[in-house]
Regions:
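Flexible glycine/proline-rich
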Residues: 14-17, 32-37, 42, 47, ...
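Short loop->beta-strand "edge-of-pocket" segments that line small-molecule binding or catalytic clefts
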Residues: 404-413, 506-526
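Ligand-binding cleft/hinge of the Venus flytrap
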Residues: 419-429, 507, 518, 524-547
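N-terminal segment of the mature folded domain
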Residues: 425-505
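A ligand-binding cleft/hinge motif common to bilobed small-molecule-binding domains
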Residues: 456-474, 556-585
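Periplasmic-binding protein-like
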Residues: 478-490, 579-608, 631
Length: 637
């Protein structure tokens, strides 16, 4: 039996940070280099910089106008205008021109009453040195411009240049080697085959290294061979100031990172009490950090963001940039284990003056949860989580300005939401759409609790076979809410090309096929349960009934990958994935909205998108939709 790794530690997040700060000192980690001032943006000064020249280096005119001798203008006032002659009484100057003897004041061109090429008339005297910039007024020779250990900004470059500085000493940017490992890892999407994984992690980490001010050295993936990995690691260590090895940090039989790091130095800790990201490894070879990041992208991101990035900033002699936090109210419960500090990706938006926070998929391999996230909620290790409605504080991962002008949507999923999001961004980006998929009933409850602006729904009234309108009066006060018409769409079974299981309808679900379901509360799940009840089919007889996905695309992906034979969804999801589709019938996909939102500019933008020709064109390309006055508002009071 192959030997498996074990985690040596379950170090708390706080202890992990302290261990790293104690193990590495910034003064020992990087050298110093001299570079041109104009190349120094975002670099860190290694020594103080003092001005060689004064700025301005001569008495200079601060305005366009005329230079005069102040004493010769004393006779001018409102009743006794004074005429001056070019040469003896004044000379023309532009902003920045030297003011030399005998001139000692400047009168702005706007204050001249009459002027020709050789004469001007003034109505008030000039004070000595009026509108004249003195030598060293901005920067004096010998004055400190920037201290050491300062991240250099654009204004610093301007000031140094004005002070006669052409070069300065900065800390050398640490070079961070990034070594992806895994036999399944490939770089070229054209060589993709079953079981292969594109090397996206090293690209993400290289960008994060750049963002932290360091220089990435991205290496080619190495297969799961202990000797080859060690050889590649040795080369990476020789060429860099720090090495990141990706994957191979957990407890698998082919996880070689810990052994490799131990071969070249010492392991400081292996295992951190965080979720996701527990398998992380940190070690050192001399003063060089050696880092093993988990292969799951979210796990790797969390460890890099919270532990590696501060370490790279330490190596450059700078503190971590200030982070922006915001408080908000959770739209649903977020449980957590007492064993870890948990980092939960969240989406948010302002509804009725409150920030509503919705947790996203918490899987360690869900890269898109990072893309969609507006922030990170950190749950302390000793906490069991938070109940729905709890006011919490979270860290923003995108600018607040992008969040505050959003239309918040909670409810059913459809690909048309992606189309609307793109159209709203094309509108100038003034308004966006923040969409969280919690199913139609999730949207109904969110509207009732004031947690969203709109709720996409497609809920069947089993008594009359109509969609959505019955919600008004049953769940909503008709005078407070309205319905925005969306689209008709075709629901049916998504199956593999050629329908190899011969699925024709719900009667075949309890046969020898594996099903993939939508989550409870979704309109698609409600439809399936209604059809099963009509046919008298026990859900327990369906293999996969309790295996749930939150979107139509996730259902289609499961069928395409072979982990399921069929799932109920919309035609467009099947078409996009090249799958076959067994139609069951049409339904109505609409939007519930509070009436007090109807005049809101962001909602008007949303409605305009629904009514647009571009929206109709894009849905025509997807297929499976019928448009009958999308954007029409129906009131039930």
């Amino acid at each position: 039996m192959k030997k498996r790794n074990i985690y040596l530690d379950n170090l708390s997040f706080e202890d992990a940070r302290k261990t790293l700060s104690d193990a590495f000192k910034s003064s020992e980690l990087t050298g110093i280099e001299t570079i041109a001032v104009y190349d120094s943006l975002n670099r860190v000064s290694a020594s103080s910089v003092t001005a060689l020249l004064s700025s301005p280096n001569h008495n200079a005119s601060a305005m366009d106008g005329i230079a005069v001798i102040a004493d010769n203008t004393e006779a001018a006032d409102e009743r006794n205008h004074l005429e001056l002659k070019l040469g003896s009484g004044f000379k023309y100057v532009d902003t920045g021109d030297p003011i030399t003897e005998p001139w000692n004041a400047v009168i702005m061109v706007e204050d001249l009453l009459e002027a020709d090429e050789r004469h001007v008339v003034i109505k008030s005297p000039a004070r000595i040195w009026q509108h004249v910039r003195h030598v060293g007024e901005d920067i004096a020779a010998g004055e400190l411009i920037i201290p050491s250990f300062q991240r250099i900004r654009a204004v610093d470059i301007g000031a140094m240049t004005a002070g006669g500085i052409t070069e300065l000493e900065v800390f050398r940017r640490p070079v961070v080697a990034i070594l992806p490992t895994g036999t399944e890892i490939i770089e070229d999407p054209e060589t993709m085959s079953e079981g292969a994984i594109l090397d996206s992690n090293s690209r993400m980490f290289a960008a994060m290294v750049l963002d932290a001010g360091a220089e990435p050295l991205r290496l080619k993936p190495v297969i799961d061979d202990r000797q080859l990995i060690k050889e590649a690691f040795a080369g990476a260590l020789e060429r860099s100031d720090a090495v990141i090895i990706i994957a191979g940090s957990s407890a698998g039989t082919e996880d070689y990172s810990a052994d490799t790091i131990r071969s070249f130095g010492e392991i400081l800790f292996h295992g951190v009490a965080v979720k996701p990201g527990k398998p992380a490894i940190f070690g050192r070879a001399g003063n060089k950090p050696l880092i093993g990041l988990p292969g799951y992208p979210v796990s790797g991101y969390v460890i890099f963001d919270r532990l590696v990035k501060p370490l790279l900033e330490l190596m450059q002699g700078i503190g971590s940039a200030a982070e922006e936090f915001r408080s908000g109210f959770l739209s649903r419960r977020v449980p957590s284990s007492l064993e870890h500090r948990e980092f939960v990706r969240v989406k948010c938006g302002k509804v009725g003056g409150r920030t509503i926070v919705s947790p996203l998929n918490r899987g360690a391999g869900i890269t898109m949860s990072l893309v969609h996230a507006d922030g990170i909620l950190e749950i302390p290790q000793e906490s069991e989580g938070y109940e729905a409605g709890t006011e919490i504080e979270f860290r923003l991962t995108r600018p607040a300005s992008e969040i505050d002008n959003r239309l918040v949507s909670i409810g059913s999923h459809d690909l048309l939401l992606d189309v609307i999001t793109e159209l709203m961004h094309k509108n100038g980006g003034r308004t966006g759409l923040s969409s969280t998929h919690q199913g139609s009933m999730g949207g109904v409850l969110a509207i009732r609790k004031g947690e969203c602006h709109i709720a996409p729904v497609h809920l069947l009234n089993v008594e009359d076979g109509r969609y959505n309108e019955y919600l008004f009066g049953k769940y909503f006060q008709p005078e407070e809410t309205a319905l925005i018409k969306g689209v008709g769409r075709t629901q049916g079974f998504i199956v593999k090309p050629g329908n190899p299981k011969g699925l024709t309808g719900v009667d075949d679900l309890s046969g020898e096929l594996v099903y993939i379901n939508r989550q409870r509360g979704s309109g698609t799940r409600v439809l399936l349960d209604y059809l099963l009840e009509q046919k008298g089919i026990d859900p327990d007889s369906i293999d996969g009934y309790y295996r749930e996905m939150t979107t139509h695309m996730a259902v289609a992906s499961a069928v395409k990958s072979g982990t399921a034979d069929a799932g109920l969804g919309v035609y467009s999801a099947a078409a996009v994935n090249g799958l076959d589709f067994i139609p069951l019938g049409n339904e109505e996909y609409d939007f519930v909205v509070r009436k007090d939102m109807l005049d809101d500019p962001s909602l008007q933008t949303f409605i305009d998108c629904l009514k647009s020709e571009e929206f109709a064109s894009e849905l025509g390309k997807l297929g499976g939709y019928e448009l009958d006055e999308p954007g029409r508002i129906i009131s039930f009071s």
